[in-house]
């Protein structure tokens, strides 16, 4: 029944609501002076029994309670990316999310569980090897440039000529590295001064 004002003071049982969500947060007795209404964020309509994992939310327009799923404070995982999402609002579990955490890197969702995504891992290892190769090629070129200058100017020492040849050989061998075999790559040895 809906609340009605009275000419008499009275004490009634009220059900308190959280401002913003109107979820049930407790009950208590409230003193109602004559010609006044209910305290803010409360109702005199009792909530239904609330099962675990739900909260009762009061709809003021309909003057009725609704049960709403409550997963706040929990973490779910996007089945497309594996990214974690911290639930901070009332409502059902978002679509395309699961409670199951991916068990490490390179996981994909198969509809019921996370499984190793060997293709994604392989692609990552290839990209990683390509970056390593590019970086090593740059280092080799940086070593070769001044040695090549000395050779071009015919002022290279025996040691510089030997190093130039070693770095050029290294760069050629490095260029031949097939990154598609990553992570099983045998990188050529970096030349060292003797």
UniProtKB/Swiss-Prot annotation:
The keyword Chaperone applies. Transmembrane segments: none annotated. Keywords: Chaperone, Viral release from host cell, Viral tail assembly, Viral tail fiber assembly. Pfam families: Caudo_TAP (PF02413). The keyword Chaperone applies. Signal peptide: none annotated. GO terms for biological process: virus tail fiber assembly. InterPro entries: Phage_T4_Gp38_tail_assem, TFA_Chaperone. Belongs to the tfa family. Chaperone that acts in assembly of the long tail fibers. Homodimer. PANTHER family: PROPHAGE TAIL FIBER ASSEMBLY PROTEIN HOMOLOG TFAE-RELATED (PTHR34413:SF2), PROPHAGE TAIL FIBER ASSEMBLY PROTEIN HOMOLOG TFAE-RELATED-RELATED (PTHR34413). This is Tail fiber assembly protein. The gene is tfa.
């Amino acid at each position: 029944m809906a609340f009605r004002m009275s000419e008499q003071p009275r004490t009634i049982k009220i059900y308190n609501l959280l401002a913003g969500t109107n979820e049930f947060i407790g009950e208590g007795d409230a003193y109602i002076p004559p010609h006044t209404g209910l305290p803010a964020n409360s109702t005199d309509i009792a909530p239904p029994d609330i099962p675990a994992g739900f909260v009762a939310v009061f709809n003021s327009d309909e003057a009725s309670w609704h049960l709403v799923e409550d997963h706040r404070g929990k973490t779910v995982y996007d089945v497309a990316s594996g990214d974690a999402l911290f639930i901070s609002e009332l409502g059902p579990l978002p679509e395309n999310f699961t409670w199951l955490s991916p068990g490490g890197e390179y996981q994909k969702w198969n509809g019921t569980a996370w499984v190793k995504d060997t293709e994604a891992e392989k692609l990552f290892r290839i990209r990683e090897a390509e970056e390593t190769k590019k970086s090593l090629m740059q280092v080799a070129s940086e070593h070769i440039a001044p040695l090549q200058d000395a050779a071009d100017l015919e002022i290279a020492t025996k040691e510089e000529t030997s190093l130039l040849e070693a770095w050029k050989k290294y760069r050629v061998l490095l260029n031949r590295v097939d990154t598609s075999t990553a992570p099983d790559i045998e990188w050529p040895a970096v030349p060292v001064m003797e």
